[in-house]
């Protein structure tokens, strides 16, 4: 009985020594296991497809949260792509979907509307369109450039604005062609001469 007890005590001694060495090598103030996972960059507010009437004011919101906690450079841009509607058939462009790319799509008729730059980890910018017109219809893109890891990363979301005629819009109909001019009335001289001839014939 003494030998097995001695072996068990020896095993417990080595186990205690191992645990003490493990605790000594761990930095003070840290938990035994660090399960922290850094957050991913994402849009916290995205624009949505909408329909407006001519003359109404339209507002689109876009907010972005970066992937790092320390401050870094963020840039948000609003772009207008004229009548670019083929993206609506792509599921990758869901309203809350995030797309990261190193290069922007080329070959599209796009116009930059506004730019806002901040130093931080969050950025937001609202696009306001006053008294929209049918020519304002099209795709609006919110693009964010994220410099959190030292290089530019591009993220963007899109929404389509449809503009319908307003309630007070005047319907312009095609003009009717001008009527043909009426024939001129007969001259008085001819009528008098005809009457005088008739009177002479009666007298004969």
Swiss-Prot record:
GO terms for cellular component: cytoplasm; extracellular region; membrane. This is V-set and transmembrane domain-containing protein 2-like protein. Residues 1-24 form the signal peptide. InterPro entries: Ig-like_dom, Ig-like_dom_sf, Ig-like_fold, Ig_sub, Ig_V-set, IgSF_V-set/TM_domain. The keyword Disulfide bond applies. Residues 188-198 have a biased composition (Basic and acidic residues). Residues 168-204 are annotated as: Disordered. The keyword Signal applies. Residues 41-158 form the Ig-like domain. Keywords: Disulfide bond, Immunoglobulin domain, Signal.
